[in-house]
Regions:
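His/Glu-rich zincin catalytic helix
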Residues: 24
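Sec-dependent signal peptide recognition
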Residues: 2-10
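Boundary of Sec targeting at the N-terminus
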Residues: 19-20
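Structured, acidic catalytic/metal-binding patches in enzyme active sites
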Residues: 27-34, 40-243
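N-terminal signal peptide c-region/cleavage motif recognized by signal peptidases
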Residues: 14-16
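Catalytic-pocket segment enriched in acidic/His residues
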Residues: 247
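Intrinsically disordered, low-complexity, compositionally biased regions/tails
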Residues: 10-11, 31
């Protein structure tokens, strides 16, 4: 049965260096083709006008699989699970995981960009902040991001409206565990400060990545994803395996 998979960006990068985001999978005994598209959470809907064959693929598919089933992600039950897993369960707090200087730096950044006072949320895991600080700074920088324009949500909602099956390749529980429990609180705190202390570089990198995606330049996206600083801020091989290759 045909399927239309909204894959995460780096899954798409792994396929080829050609300038295209939509891939047709056929042959090898398949009765009908399937399609794979690489999505990017910061890409506007206008990218769809540039993807050759997209409308045809959406029309022909009989089911749609995304990284996650977006309707479930928005459910009260899932939101409650996320609220539980993003909080520190032991005696640690943000102020004990960070030095006084780092806590002050992180708190200043979060107040200015996330409208969040860390003193009022001492049990938040650093990974929760880490997953938001770069995007928040990027959105503030470009000033024209529409959070309602999410490609994954669009593809799935279109499929639902047309009576097609929709599901996810991963569960919310799997992703929550990966993002918030995949590495120690100390490592989370270290990576948080790496990001905040280099926020301009991180925003510029994300800007370059988004521009490359809009050009469907997979070569450039791969190069950006492989850039390293040569210090403790770089992902370890184990972290890369968990986040990209072993999923």
């Amino acid at each position: 049965m045909k399927s239309f998979i909204g894959a995460v960006l780096f899954i798409c990068v792994a396929f080829s260096a050609n300038a295209q985001l939509l891939w047709k999978v056929s042959g090898n005994g398949l009765n009908q083709p399937s399609y794979i598209i690489g999505t990017h959470h910061l890409a506007p809907f206008s990218i769809m006008d540039s993807i050759a064959g997209l409308q045809k693929a959406m029309k022909e598919t009989q089911q749609v699989y995304g990284e996650l089933k977006m309707s479930e992600m928005q459910s009260p039950v899932t939101m409650q699970k996320m609220q539980q897993v993003m909080m520190i369960a032991n005696d640690s707090t943000l102020s004990t995981l960070l030095s006084p200087e780092d806590f002050a730096t992180a708190n200043k950044f979060c107040k200015e960009n996330l409208m969040l006072d860390l003193s009022a949320a001492p049990k938040l895991k650093p990974a929760f902040l880490l997953n938001n600080v770069v995007v928040a700074a990027y959105v503030k920088h470009i000033g024209k991001f529409n959070p309602q324009e999410q490609l994954d949500t669009f593809f799935q909602s279109q499929a639902t409206q047309n009576g097609k099956k929709v599901d996810g390749l991963e569960t919310a529980e799997f992703q929550f565990n990966l993002l918030f429990n995949g590495y120690s609180l100390q490592r989370q705190a270290q990576l948080l400060m790496c990001t905040i202390n280099n926020i301009n570089t991180e925003v510029e990198s994300l800007k370059k990545l988004t521009n490359a995606y809009m050009r469907q330049d997979l070569n450039q996206m791969l190069r950006i994803s492989e850039e390293r600083k040569g210090n403790q801020c770089d992902p370890t091989p184990g972290e890369e395996d968990a986040m990209i290759y072993n999923r």
